[in-house]
A protein has these predicted regions:
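Soluble accessory domains appended to multi-pass membrane transport proteins
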Residues: 6-115
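Long, non-transmembrane cytosolic or organellar matrix-exposed soluble domains/tails
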Residues: 97-189
Length: 189
């Protein structure tokens, strides 16, 4: 009965990437029978899961991500809040070559300009799907600084390509922080 429920409700298909909590299954479904689902994990091990456990418990199916046109990516960088300040006219002039400086007067912070710069950078990145939500936002401050979160979706859902895009964006965000007079929190300091 469980195998029929999986099929009729289109809960899982061969080729779906699934994660089953409480088991070692975290990979691609390679076979579905009435009583078992075989999953090939990313380390090439095979895990067999009873179909009833997929019907009676929750599991994560990544099919929606693969069909949805993007894989969600988040990067959090903790900014040392002691480095945040209002920009001087000289700083604004220098940074205007990197980012469009808003015409709102004297109260523009280096952090605001950095956030705007990153938002423009991810919007222009060829690996990012701009048809899905992209943003750069602040999270609640912590003892390690103010997290600046890059939130976007990669165009390609392949794990290796996703990690490549994420690395490019993370590298760029870390390297460009200094240009804005900002410092990323570092445990070693």
């Amino acid at each position: 009965v469980s195998g029929i429920q999986l099929s009729v409700n289109d809960m899982v298909r061969t080729g779906d990437w699934i994660v089953v909590q409480g088991t070692l299954a975290n990979g691609v479904v390679i076979d579905i029978t009435l009583i078992t689902v075989k999953v090939q994990n990313f380390d090439n091990t095979i895990v067999t899961v009873p179909t009833y456990s997929l019907v009676t418990s929750s599991f994560q199916n990544w099919r929606g991500m693969e069909e949805g046109g993007g894989r969600r990516m988040t990067v959090n960088l903790n900014i040392d809040m002691d480095c945040v300040h209002f920009c001087t006219p000289d700083e604004l002039e220098h940074l205007s070559s990197k980012v469009q400086v808003p015409a709102k007067g004297d109260h523009i912070t280096n952090l605001e300009l950095y956030r705007t710069y990153l938002a423009t950078y991810i919007h222009r990145h060829p690996g990012i799907n701009n048809n899905i939500l992209t943003m750069v936002r602040y999270m609640d401050p912590t003892s390690t600084g103010l997290p600046v979160q890059i939130y976007c979706f990669t165009k390609n859902t392949s794990w290796a390509i996703y990690e490549g895009v994420k690395s490019q964006i993370t590298d760029h965000a870390i390297a460009s922080a200094r240009d804005f007079g900002l410092k990323i929190f570092n445990w070693g300091e």
